Every structure is written in C-alpha cells, then in structure tokens.
Amino acid sequence: MAPADLASEGPKLEDPPAPHLFGKCPSGLIMAKLETLPVRADPGRDPLLAFAPRPSELGPPDPRLTMGSVGSGVTHAQEFPMKSVGTRTGGGGNQGSFPGPRSGGSGANRERPGRYPSEDKVLANSLYLNGELRGSDHTDVCGNVVGSSGGSSSSGGSDKAPPQYREPNHPPKLLTTSGKLDQCSEPLVRPSAFKPVVPKNFHSMQNLCPPQTNGTPEGRQGPAGLKGGLDKSRTMTPAGGSGGGLSDSGRNSLTSLPTYSSSYSQHLAPLSASTSHINRIGTAGYSSGSSGGGSGYQDLGTSDSGRASSKSGSSSSMGRSGHLGSGEGGNGGLPFAACSPPSPSALIQELEERLWEKEQEVAALRRSLEQSEAAVAQVLEERQKAWERELAELRQGCSGKLQQVARRAQRAQQGLQLQVLRLQQDKKQLQEEAAQLIRQREELEDKVAVCQKEQADFLPRMEETKWEVCQKAGEISLLKQQLKDSQADVSQKLSEIVGLRSQLREGRASLREKEEQLLSLRDSFGSKQASLELSEGELPPACLKPALTPVDLVEPQEALASCESDEAKMRRQAGVAAAASLVSVDGEVEAGGEGGTRALRREVGRLQAELAAERRARERQGASFAEERRVWLEEKEKVIEYQKQLQLSYVEMYQRNQQLERRLRERGAAGGSSTPTPQHGEEKKAWTPSRLERIESTEI
C-alpha cells in the first residue's frame, strides 16, 4: 500500500476509560481513553469535518471565535481567539482536579495572539515510507530508550500491522461539502485559509532524538503506552509545508488558500501540533528549579498551534505539568534519575483539555469557512469566468495566428515546392545538355582524331604535290623558253617569207617586162626578117654586111646585171641566151635561110618549157611555205591548248590545296590542335609567278 493511500487517524475521546490502561482512577476523576479513528482521504469531502466536535459538546458559538471572511469581497473580518495549551488557571496545583465547564470560565477563554508565530510551530515526526512510524520509541526520565508499543500483549499490537498499513474499519461519518461549488462544470479546488507554522524551539528538541524502529506492541499499559499512542497520532501530520495544513487566520486572502493534498495526514495537523511535545513532559521535569518546578518547563513551553506568544501562559501550563511530575517524586529539586514520571490522570486531563480546545478551534474554523464559502465561490466563479473569457480570447487569437501561420507556411511550402520542381526541371535540362555536350565532345574528338589521321596522310601527299608543282613549273618555264625561241624563228621565217614574196612580185614584174620585150623583139624580128627578105631579094649577097654581134648585145646588159637579184640574173641570163640564140638564129637565117627559122622556133619552145618549169617550182615552193605555216599554226594551237590545260590543272590543284588547308584550320581550331598554318601573304608570294605565266601565255 502506498503512503498516499494510508488512512489518517484522528483522535477521539470515549467514556469511560479502559481499566486495563490506567488501572484504578481516583474518585472525582473521569478517565478518558485516546482512540484513533481512520479517515479516508476523499477529494469530494471536507478534511475539516474529521475534527468536528460531538453534538453534546458543542455550545453556543462565541462571537469572538468567528473568523473573518477569506475573500476580499466580505467585510467585518475579525480574528478569533485560540486557547493555548496549559493556560487554564482553575484547579490551582491540584493535579487531580478537572476544569469547569468548557463553555465557561475565565481560564478557558483567555485572549490569545491572532497569528501563528512561525517559531512556535511544532513539526510532526515524519512517516517512513517502508517502515514504522517515526517517534515510536522514546527515552524515559532516566534516559533509557523505551518503545511506545512494546511490553504488553493484551492489546494484540505485536501481531498487528503498523497503523499506516491498516485498512479502515469503517468510513468516516461526515457530510459532504456545500453544494455551492458543485454547479461548476469542472471540479474546483477546496481552499484552506491556514498553513502549519513550525516553531523553532520544540523542533530543535524534537530532532535531538534520531528515528528508531517500533519494536514493541502499541497496547502497552502505563505512560509509555500513552505516549506511544500520542506519538502515533502525532506522526500522521504533514512534514513541514504540505498543501493540506492550516495557514494563519489573519491572512484572509485567496493567495493563502492551498489546494487539496492527496495525503491522509492533513486532517490531524492541528491536533498533532498541539500534542507533539507531550512525550517530553516527563523528561523535562529535572531541569526545573527548587522554587516549585514552574521555571523548569519554561524553556519547553511552546504553544500547541504556534499562537502562544504570551510567556506567562506557557510558563503556567508547563509549570502545572512540572508540578504534576514533582508531586509524584515528592521533591522537585531531586536529581534527574530520582524523578518519577507524571501521573496518567494528569496527562489524560491535559490531553482532554487540549483536545477540547482543538475541537473548539475546528468548529470556529468550520463556521468561518462556511460563512466565507459563498464569497470564495463567487470570487472563484468570477475568476473562472474571466479565465474562461481570456482563454477563449487567447484561443481565438491563437487560432487566428495559427491559421495565418498555417496559410503562410502553406504558401511558403507551395512556393518551395514550385522552386523544387523548377530546380528539378532545370537540373534535368542541365543534365540533358551536359550529356549532349559530352556526346558532341566525343564526336568532335573522333572527328579531330580522323582529321589528324587525314592530315597525317595529306602531309606527304602535299609534299609530293608541291614537288610535282615545282617540277611542272620548271617544265612550263622550259616550254615557254622553247616557245619564245620558236616564236623568234617563226618571226624570222615570216620576215624571210615577206622578202621572198616581194622578190617574187619583182621577178613576176621583170618577167612580164621580158615577155613584153620578147614580143617586141619578135615583132621587130619579124619586121626585120620581112625587110631582109625584101632586101635580099633586091641586093646581091656580096653586098650584104653582118648585123650587130652578140658581144655588142651582151656588153650593155652586163652593167645592168650587177644590180639585179638572182632571179633577175637568171631571167637576164635566159634573155641573153635567148638573144644570143636569136642572133645566132638570125645569123643562121641570114646565113642559111629557112633552117635558121626552125632553130629559132625550137629555142623559143625550149625557153617556154623552162619558164613553165620555173613556174611549177615557184608553185611548189609556195605550197611548201603554206604547209610549213599550217604546221606551225597547228603546233601553236597545240601549245596554247596545253598551256590552258596546264593552267587549269594548276588552278584546280591550288584551289584544292586551299580547301584542304581551310578544313585543316577549321578542324584544328575546333579540336584545339596547334597545327601551324601557312600565312596568306606567303601563299600569294609563292603563287605570283604562275599568275604572270598565265598572263604571258594568254598574250601569245
């Protein structure tokens, strides 16, 4: 069983007292037995109902005992006086006398301070979680450790479980709280206006004794058993500052109202505080002086509930307890070992008085709480409504802000999603472009490799073509030189042909003149022959003289022959020969008659034949000249055609070389190759002679 589920035990007085506890009582004394009743902790029940007085003991309420309202809305708040322990004056020093009626008497209703002094509150002994009650063992007046529950087995405490582990025999017969707070939808916290105040003096004395285990049964007879029962009832109180204790009655504010506590020990907080030092009364008698023993208990005179600020009341109460202790011993000034403990009847009477005072206090507290319950409920309801309104406003504002934040987050998320989609698309596009560029680079690398191979193949071919071009250029220059020589020869031949043509014209003209002379000579010969025939017929032969001799004819002709050409000379010689033959013929004719005429005719025929042969020779020579001219023209046409073809092939080769060089430069620039390319100026300078040659060849 957990400590929170333990049953709290409250004190109860029953009459008559048990004879086996205290034995015979003197006449006039009413013995009382202290019994603890279990009270179950219930959040729906008022914890203060456990200390409600019996109906027979309740008297008319004292106006001074009414408590002021706790809430700020209730007026006429006043403090109620509390009766401290041991302040009764009735009875004097008689230890067996009882006080008068509890509702009257000046000793029972003394004025007390309105606040609980924190230095006078007694801390109850704490309860061990897994063991017996603390304070179950104590020391007697002789300094010996005595168990409060040991010795006697008549009560059967040795075989019983500790009280904190016992199940309650019957639930407490208490009424529920007022129904004013039951209308709330949620359970409200029952406030309590009092807190336990811990005194300093008795707390320091209480801690002098270390916690010890309870090894003896709790039903032992005598004072030790009584003090053990008191210790058990006292150890059920909360240990310093629990939420279920009672606060100062003067602090009438809602801030001093603690919440419910789940422990069961809060019901006995006022009683345990007032009875916590009873077990030390017998041991404190040795410290009193020889003057009646009143001053011996002055240092231990603490108030039961922390409100005994009057030193005289405490001294009188403790002095009476000391007197009871000294009466048993017979001498208050005896040593501590010789002192006898106080009588049980005095202790019971003192406990009964204190219990009655506590009941009165509880009743006053109950009445004050009932009076202030409406105000507290109203304040709590107002505060609850205000809190609900604030909570609704906060919820509305927070919901609006959350919606705004959600919308912003949604828009931001949508924007981020769009950006992510765009980035993914850009990434895919860039990847495709990168793949395409990689493929293009690979293709270009392959093309560059092929171009490099072609270039490696073209270089020797280009060298060969260059050598061939140089060789062809040399051949062309040689052919041009030969052409120039042939052109010079042809021009010389042409000039000779022109001279020959002029000579032929001159020969033809001279030949016509000779023919004309020959015709004139023939006419003159015929006329002379006719005249001769006439003269011959008239004159005698002896009288006839010879004509001009051939020598006379040849002499004037030799002077002219030096100025004539070969053909003219030939013609002149032929003419001279013909003239000579004519002279001879004439001579023969003259000499011989008709025979000379026939010879002349034969000579003329021969000369005509020679002339025809000469004409045929000239015709053959003209035909040979024409053939030579034709052959020369054909050769010239062939040379020009060859030059044209050579120039065309050279131009085509040049263009092909330029195209190859341009392709090599383009591929070198694309592939990043550093192949040196010839400059344009060098190409122009290298091919300038071919251009001049082409011009010269076209001018021919």
UniProtKB/Swiss-Prot annotation:
Residues 322-333 have a biased composition (Gly residues). Residues 109-121, 680-700 have a biased composition (Basic and acidic residues). Residues 248-265, 301-321 have a biased composition (Low complexity). Residues 345-523, 597-666 form a coiled coil. GO terms for biological process: regulation of dendritic spine morphogenesis. Residues 203-216 have a biased composition (Polar residues). The modification Phosphoserine is found at residues 343, 345. It holds the Pfam family Fez1. GO terms for cellular component: cytoplasm; cytoskeleton; dendritic spine; postsynaptic density; synapse. Keywords: Cell projection, Coiled coil, Cytoplasm, Cytoskeleton, Phosphoprotein, Synapse. It is found in: Synapse; Postsynaptic density; Cell projection, Dendritic spine; Cell projection, Dendrite. Residues 1-20, 40-121, 133-188, 202-344, 662-700 are annotated as: Disordered. May be involved in promoting the maturation of dendritic spines, probably via regulating SIPA1L1 levels at the postsynaptic density of synapses. Interacts (via C-terminus) with SHANK3 (via PDZ domain). Interacts (via coiled coil) with SIPA1L1. Can form homooligomers. Belongs to the LZTS3 family. This is Leucine zipper putative tumor suppressor 3. It comes from Mus musculus (Mouse). The lineage of its organism: Eukaryota, Metazoa, Chordata, Craniata, Vertebrata.
